[in-house]
C-alpha cells in the first residue's frame, strides 16, 4: 500500500490488489516506529496521522522477575517523533488508501485474490486474480509482491527461499485493560511452564498479549487446556488474573508460527518482492512492518522515474535488492542472536531464574539503551522520501499528455 501510494503520488499508474473485503485483521503488526513516522512527516501527512487514535511508547521496558528494566530510550533519536506509535494496522492502511485516492493514478481493488502470474516469454507481465464477480487478469510493466510471509506471488514465481531456524512461536490474544493496571512493560520475563516471555502492547482499552512459546509447543499447550494456559499467564501478570477469565475459547488465541527467511533473489524480469514476501522477519523488536515500509520507500525512490517512462529493467529491480539487502541481513542476524540468547538458552525455561545475557548487558551498561533504541526505532538503514509529488496539472492531464506507463 505504501509503495502504491508513493508511486501514484509520483505520477505512476498503480493498481493495488487486496485479498480481503477490508483491512481488519487482528494481531497484525500494529506498531509504527520512529523511522516510519519520519517518512510520514516527510510526506506532509504527520499531522493527519497523529489525529488517528493511537498510543505512544517513549521507552521500552521489561519486567525480569520483579525488577523493571528500561531496555530502550527513544528520547535521543534524531527524528521528529521520538516514540513508537501503537495503532491498529487497519487504521494505518485505511489512512494510506484514503490519501492515495487523492491521486487519479491510484486504484485499489478489494476482494481481489491473486492466484497466479501472467508470463510473456521470460518476463512476468501481470497477475490473475479472483473476485466475487469472477476471475480477471491485470497486465503491468511491473508486478510487486507485497503479500506477506505466505506470499502467493513469490511461490508462483518459483523464487528460492533461504530459511533460518527459529526456536519460538507466539500465541496472540486480548486481555481487557483495567484502570488500575500498571504502566506498560513491553515484556515480562517470568519463567512459566511453557511460556518463555509475555509481550503486552497497550491498545487503549485492552492489552494485546503475545505469549512466546517454544517452537512447536502449541499442540502441547492446547492439550493441557485453556484453564491451564490462563493460569500460566496469570502467574506472569497477576494484575490481569480477573480479566483473563474472559478468555473462554481457543478461537480467541491465534498462533503465529514464527519464521525467519529471505529470498536469494528478490526479482525476476517484470517482478519484485518486498517486505515479508522478500524476507520474513522475527517478531523480535516488532520491526517487521517498519522494514517493509523502508523497502517501499527505497523501491519508489529507485523506480518511480523509470516506471513513469516505461523503461524499468531487471538491473533496476536488482538495485532495490542491493539497496535493502544489507540492512535486512543485519537485522535478521540481530534478531536470531536475541532469539537464541533470550528464548533458547534459558530465558524462561521451567525453573530457570537466570537473566538473559542481553538484559544483563543492558543493566550493566545503561548507554546500550540508546543502541537498542536505535535498532528498534531506526534500523540499520532508514530510508527517506526522494520522490517528488507531481503537481496537480500533471495528475489532471488528459491521458494522451501523460508519459507512457
Model-derived features: positions:
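FAD-binding beta-loop-beta segment adjacent to the flavin cofactor pocket
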Residues: 256-273, 329-330, 347
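Glycine-rich FAD pyrophosphate-binding loop
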Residues: 5-28
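Glycine-rich phosphate/pyrophosphate-binding beta-alpha loops
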Residues: 258-263, 278-290, 326
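Generic enzyme active-site microenvironment
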Residues: 16-17, 145, 188, 274
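Active-site-adjacent segment of FAD-dependent monooxygenases/related oxidoreductases
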Residues: 33-101, 121
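C-terminal helical "tail/cap" subdomain of flavin- and related membrane-associated enzymes
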Residues: 301-405
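Conserved FAD-binding catalytic core of PHBH/FMO-like flavoproteins
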Residues: 112, 123-137, 142-254, 258, ...
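A conserved beta-strand/loop element that lines the FAD pocket in flavoprotein oxidoreductases
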Residues: 100-115
Amino acid at each position: 500500500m505504501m509503495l502504491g501510494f508513493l508511486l501514484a503520488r509520483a505520477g505512476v499508474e498503480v493498481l493495488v490488489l487486496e485479498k480481503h473485503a477490508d483491512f481488519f485483521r487482528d494481531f497484525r503488526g500494529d506498531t509504527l516506529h520512529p523511522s516510519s513516522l519520519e517518512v510520514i512527516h516527510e510526506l506532509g501527512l504527520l499531522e493527519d496521522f497523529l489525529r488517528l487514535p493511537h498510543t505512544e511508547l517513549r521507552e521500552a521496558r521489561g519486567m525480569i522477575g520483579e525488577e523493571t528494566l528500561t531496555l530502550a530510550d527513544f528520547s535521543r533519536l534524531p527524528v521528529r517523533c521520538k516514540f513508537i506509535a501503537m495503532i491498529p494496522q487497519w487504521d494505518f492502511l485505511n489512512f494510506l488508501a484514503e490519501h492515495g485516492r487523492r491521486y487519479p493514478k491510484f486504484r485499489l481493488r478489494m476482494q481481489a485474490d491473486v492466484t497466479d502470474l501472467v508470463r510473456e516469454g521470460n518476463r512476468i507481465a501481470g497477475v490473475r486474480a479472483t473476485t466475487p464477480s469472477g476471475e480477471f487478469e491485470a497486465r503491468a510493466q511491473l508486478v510487486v509482491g507485497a503479500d506477506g510471509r505466505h506470499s502467493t506471488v513469490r511461490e508462483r514465481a518459483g523464487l528460492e527461499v533461504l530459511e533460518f531456524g527459529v526456536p519460538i512461536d507466539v500465541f496472540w490474544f486480548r486481555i481487557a485493560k483495567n484502570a488500575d493496571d500498571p504502566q506498560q512493560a513491553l515484556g515480562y520475563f517470568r519463567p512459566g511452564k511453557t511460556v518463555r516471555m509475555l509481550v503486552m502492547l497497550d491498545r487503549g482499552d485492552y492489552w494485546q498479549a503475545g505469549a512466546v512459546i517454544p517452537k512447536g509447543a502449541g499442540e502441547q499447550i492446547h492439550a493441557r487446556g485453556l484453564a491451564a494456559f490462563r493460569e500460566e499467564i496469570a502467574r506472569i501478570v497477576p494484575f490481569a488474573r480477573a480479566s483473563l477469565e474472559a478468555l473462554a475459547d481457543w478461537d480467541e488465541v491465534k498462533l503465529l508460527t514464527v519464521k525467519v527467511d529471505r529470498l536469494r533473489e528478490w526479482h525476476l524480469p517484470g517482478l519484485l518482492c518486498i517486505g515479508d514476501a522478500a524476507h520474513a522477519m522475527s517478531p523480535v523488536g516488532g520491526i517487521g512492518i517498519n522494514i517493509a515500509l523502508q523497502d517501499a520507500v527505497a523501491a519508489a525512490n529507485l523506480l518511480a522515474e523509470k516506471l513513469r517512462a516505461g523503461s524499468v529493467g531487471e538491473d533496476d529491480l536488482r538495485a532495490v535488492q542491493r539497496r535493502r539487502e544489507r540492512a535486512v541481513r543485519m537485522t535478521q542476524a540481530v534478531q536470531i542472536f536475541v532469539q537464541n540468547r533470550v528464548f533458547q538458552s534459558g530465558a524462561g525455561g521451567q525453573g530457570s531464574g537466570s537473566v538473559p545475557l542481553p538484559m544483563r548487558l543492558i543493566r550493566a551498561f545503561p548507554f546500550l539503551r540508546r543502541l537498542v533504541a536505535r535498532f528498534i526505532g531506526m534500523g540499520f538503514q532508514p530510508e527517506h522520501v526522494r520522490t517528488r509529488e507531481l503537481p496537480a496539472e500533471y495528475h489532471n492531464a488528459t491521458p494522451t499528455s501523460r508519459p507512457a506507463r
